[in-house]
Amino acid sequence: ANPIQVKALFRRTIDTGIQHGTVTVMIGDDGYEVTTYRMDGEYEDHRHPKEVLFTPNLNEDLKRRDFTINAMAYNPRVGIVDLYGGREDLEKKVIRCVGEANERFDEDALRMLRGIRFAGQLQFELEEKTFLAIKEKAPTLVNVSAERIRTELTKLIVSKGSDKLLLAVETGLSAYFLPELEKMLATTQENPHHCFDVGHHSLAAISHINDLGEQAGFRTKERVMLAYAALLHDVAKPDCKQVDDEGIAHFYKHPEYGA
């Protein structure tokens, strides 16, 4: 059904994204988003299609999705509709693009960071071709707004798999939103107080602070603030490192420079 047909079927609706085919149907105090099957036109900026076309064909809608685990549907008559192996990838805990990974990332560069975020939240692995496509297309992330990148990064670092942020370094993606992280991972800490390099130490700090925040019942806003503090608390160490005559590393004034 197209948005006009959906609105005609229900007494109370809200046009939450009607230009993209989305109408919120209100039943009592609860809202349910109903989105018409869509086909995307040509993408012009590695982010947005020039036009969105409605279609009655579910297959056309599913093939425009980003990852196989997001390209399944359910019909009460036929059950799960799974044209791209999403169910198998769920069972194997794999993030895989629908169709050609390079094409999916050419269409929308944010999908690269979303894939890593899903890997963290679900504690899945990136399928090899998806990983390699992110590596190739990483420079196109410059077409994505800082706000959208921040949203994905925030969801990643407060997740159970926050250490999947390493995938952003391994693919070269972090160079376009957090270039300091690669330097942190390359900075060793030769002193009695640390057993990790700066980067792995910071990732471990995020993991611990997430666990503590969950145990303490912190609100999401508080957990986000603490996760970013853990991520960035040693961000200036690579530029402040000094090694004394005994081979001990010092990072004088790194908190001030980091702030």
Which residues make up each language-model segment?
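Catalytic cores of the polymerase beta-like nucleotidyltransferase superfamily
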Residues: A1-A259
